[in-house]
Amino acid sequence: MTEFLFCFSCCIGEQPQPKRRRRIDRSMIGEPMNFVHTAHVGSGDANTGFAMGGSFQDQMKSKGGYTPGISEVAL
C-alpha cells in the first residue's frame, strides 16, 4: 500500500490548513457610529412583524415615540 501512495505522491499533496478566523475581544470593538434610535421592540412584537404597505416611518410611528417633557427616568 505504501508503494501505491509513493507512486502518486506528486498528485496527493499536503492540504493547506484552513485559515483560522481572528478572535475578536471587547477591546477591538468601538462605540456605534451614526446610530439612530428608532423604537423599542418587545418580545410580543417579534410575532406580529411589520404591516405590509406604508412607509417605514409610518410603521415606526405606530410603535410610539418620546413625548416632549417626559424623561426616561420618569418612565
From Swiss-Prot:
One of its GO terms (molecular function) is small GTPase binding. InterPro entries: CRIB_dom (IPR000095), CRIB_dom_sf (IPR036936), SPEC (IPR039056). Residues 29-42 form the CRIB domain. Keywords: Cell membrane, Cell shape, Cytoplasm, Cytoskeleton, Lipoprotein, Membrane, Palmitate. GO terms for cellular component: cytoplasm; cytoskeleton; plasma membrane. It is found in: Cytoplasm, Cytoskeleton; Cell membrane. A lipid is attached at C10, C11 (S-palmitoyl cysteine). The keyword Lipoprotein applies. One of its GO terms (biological process) is regulation of cell shape. Coiled coil: none annotated. The keyword Endoplasmic reticulum does not apply. It is a lipid-anchor. Probably involved in the organization of the actin cytoskeleton by acting downstream of CDC42, inducing actin filament assembly. Belongs to the CDC42SE/SPEC family. This is CDC42 small effector protein 2-C.
